[in-house]
């Protein structure tokens, strides 16, 4: 997985070797996109306990140009068609996870429990159509997850395989736009009638 902006996804792939490792990566893409990933594994030699921390961060300003949209001219008095940059379409995501468990035991070929937290902040530039421009609207979400997985070959009977998993997630999402403003593609705005009435 992984994309180059436009609210890209975090790419996390864990290794399967039973040894310590640490992988750190950082990348830069178009539209002010930045990605950073950390994947590690630590094995306790005596018990064989495996701990795998993972962190992924993705940020993009997404300030690419729109094509042939209506916008105000420099005076602000007339409308023209131009190619302005998106000015409120940033994206930030964070995923932090820790997994712990065992492999190649008499009672399990693999058993892991994990806990993770993810966060996404997305600026909203337009509504369902591109001539509806926003300048302060945002969508924020948080998610917690706990899970467990168990794998055993030759379970009870020879060649019988058991794969079991449990997972529970708590999600919270909020979309906010408290600014009573009408925005234009040049980044300017006028105060909406509703806000004017509030101040009266």
What are the language-model segments listed below?
Residues 27, 46-129:
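Periplasmic-side early beta-strands and strand-to-turn transitions of outer-membrane beta-barrels
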């Amino acid at each position: 997985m992984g994309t180059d902006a436009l609210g890209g996804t975090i790419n996390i792939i864990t290794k399967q070797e039973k040894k310590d490792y640490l992988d750190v990566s950082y990348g830069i893409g178009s539209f002010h996109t930045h990605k950073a990933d950390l994947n590690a594994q630590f094995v306790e030699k005596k018990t064989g306990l495996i701990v795998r921390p993972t962190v992924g961060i993705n940020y993009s300003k997404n300030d690419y140009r729109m094509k042939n949209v209506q916008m105000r001219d420099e005076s602000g008095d007339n409308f023209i068609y131009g190619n302005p940059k998106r000015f409120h379409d940033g994206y930030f995501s964070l995923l932090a996870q820790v997994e712990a468990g065992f492999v190649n035991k008499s009672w399990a070929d693999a058993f892991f429990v994990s806990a993770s937290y993810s966060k996404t902040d997305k600026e909203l530039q337009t509504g369902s159509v591109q001539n509806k421009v926003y300048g302060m609207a945002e969508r924020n979400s948080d998610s917690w997850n706990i899970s467990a997985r168990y794998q055993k070959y030759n379970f009870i009977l020879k060649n019988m395989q058991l794969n079991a998993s449990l997972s529970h997630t708590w999600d919270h999402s909020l979309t906010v736009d408290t600014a009573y403003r009408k925005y234009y593609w040049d980044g300017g705005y006028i105060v909406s009638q509703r806000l004017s009435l509030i101040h009266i």
